[in-house]
A protein has these predicted regions:
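Active-site beta-strand termini and strand-to-loop segments that position acidic
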Residues: 53-57
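Nucleic-acid endonuclease domains
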Residues: 1-50, 64-297
């Protein structure tokens, strides 16, 4: 999930994007095979622990892992069994959170996918007309303000010589996602009415070639975004590996701790304490689907 994932905000967003992609692909996979499931409401970035798929009346919690190193991706293609020795990880705080049941299902998935994270890689992607999604992440004072009050009127200004379309993303009073698209004329400023209680990120369809400024008029707080202060959070993956599943009760019975800072297949260094079962000890996903069809789950 976003905040416990650690790393740069753009790395965290890429992992969140990968998780959303896995969830959507899983639902499509179920639909194509006429496997019945319920949708409980998509999990937003602001509360990614909220599950969205129920199988046989049981909560299905998908734990997805983005594998973005070329060497690992090549190894997974040459020898898919390499992931059998990887740990199936669940963050300890997530596992212990309220609202879980021992009947919950943990489903583990790997998404091998490249990222274009550096400025040079991003320029190559844009020049080649490949898919990309450019965002700038706002500081914590904008994303998670100390007091939950309206931000007030926002003023956005562009120093570019051509018009630019931006999408502002944040939260409203009820902490639901709020998106607003605004076009900024060349070297002009645009005032945005009071619509946000927090502002998390700004998305630009085209790479800005000049600075963009945003000011919170009520707090008189300004934030400048340089032409190189954007990250590409697109994940270039074509397939997803559904590694296996366990009930939460069985997972907790078998799991051993993996402490913060440990090196594992998925991460150079884990950011939080996890519980883990080896992937080789998971039950095959085919068994899960068969039990759903036979109503024996």
């Amino acid at each position: 999930t976003y905040h416990r994932a650690g790393g740069s905000p753009y790395s965290r967003l890429r992992r969140t994007v990968a998780g959303v992609a896995v969830g959507l692909a899983f639902r499509r996979y179920l639909s194509e095979r006429n496997i019945p499931f319920d949708v409980k409401g998509a999990a937003p970035f602001t509360n990614p622990d909220r599950y969205d798929v129920s199988l046989g009346g049981r909560r299905c919690d998908i734990q997805s892992f983005l594998i973005s190193h070329r060497e690992q991706i090549s190894e997974m293609k040459r020898n898919p069994q390499v992931i059998l020795n990887a740990p199936a990880l669940v963050p300890s705080d997530q596992n212990a959170a309220e609202g879980h049941s021992d009947r919950d299902i943990y489903l583990f998935a790997f998404l091998p996918g490249l990222v274009a994270a550096s400025q040079e890689e991003m320029r190559k992607v844009v020049a080649a007309n490949q898919p990309h999604y450019l965002v700038h992440v706002l500081p914590d004072s904008w994303m998670r303000p100390a007091a939950w009050n309206p931000l007030g009127a926002l003023v956005v200004k562009s120093e570019a010589e051509e018009a630019i379309t931006l999408e502002l993303g944040g939260q409203d009073e009820g902490r639901e996602t709020r998106l607003l698209e605004v076009e900024i004329p060349p070297r002009k400023r645009v005032e945005i009415p009071n619509e946000f209680f927090s502002l998390a990120r700004i998305h630009s369809k085209a790479p800005p070639n000049a600075r963009i400024g945003i000011r919170n008029m009520s707090e008189n707080e300004a934030h400048m975004i340089g032409a190189f202060d954007w990250g590409n959070i697109w994940v270039y993956g074509m397939e997803i590996v559904l590694a296996g599943f366990l009930s939460r009760e069985e997972f907790n019975r078998r799991a051993t701790p993996v402490y913060e800072g440990a090196r594992v297949f998925q991460y150079e260094k884990t950011r939080v304490k996890n519980l883990a079962v080896s992937v080789v000890d998971l039950k095959p996903v085919a068994e899960l689907f068969e039990r759903i069809k036979e109503h024996t789950l």
